[in-house]
Amino acid sequence: MGLRRESRELALQMLYALDSNASVGPREMLQMFREEQPVSDRLRLFAEELVQGVLEHRPAIDAAIKARSKNWSLSRMPKVDLNIMRLATYELMFRGDIPKKVSINEAIEIARRFGDKDSPAFVNGILDEIPSCAKAEEPDREQ
């Protein structure tokens, strides 16, 4: 398993923990993970970068997921699947340095590992709609 996959999995665990424990804020949660998860600095830094990006852009990320999830409210989605999609959607919408196919494939593989049997297809079905829409929603940078 590659360094970035491990970082994404660690980021998923952080986001899931934040969703599951409203009494702990993001800074405290990141500090807890630093103390309790013995990982390399490179792995931890990319994971924290992903988590901070998701938290910073969460309203836009959740809106993009919600707009593409027919008959599913965010509150009904399994937390693991939702946080996998949040990570990938952050990459798709805000990280031009990561190819869209890579983000989606990584999300599907993480869903296979952490989700249930339906998670990979569910995650893929929603994320597959985001790249073309996210690209259309980006401002024209040449102006």
Swiss-Prot record:
Cited InterPro entries: NusB-like_sf, NusB_fam, NusB_RsmB_TIM44
Aminoacyl-tRNA synthetase among keywords: no
GO biological process, one term: transcription antitermination
A single GO cellular-component term on record: cytosol
Residue ranges the record marks as coiled coil: none
The entry's keywords: RNA-binding, Transcription, Transcription antitermination, Transcription regulation
Pfam families: NusB
Any one GO molecular function term: RNA binding
Task performed by this protein: Involved in transcription antitermination. Required for transcription of ribosomal RNA (rRNA) genes. Binds specifically to the boxA antiterminator sequence of the ribosomal RNA (rrn) operons.
Similarity-based family: Belongs to the NusB family.
Record protein name field: Transcription antitermination protein NusB
Gene it is expressed from: nusB
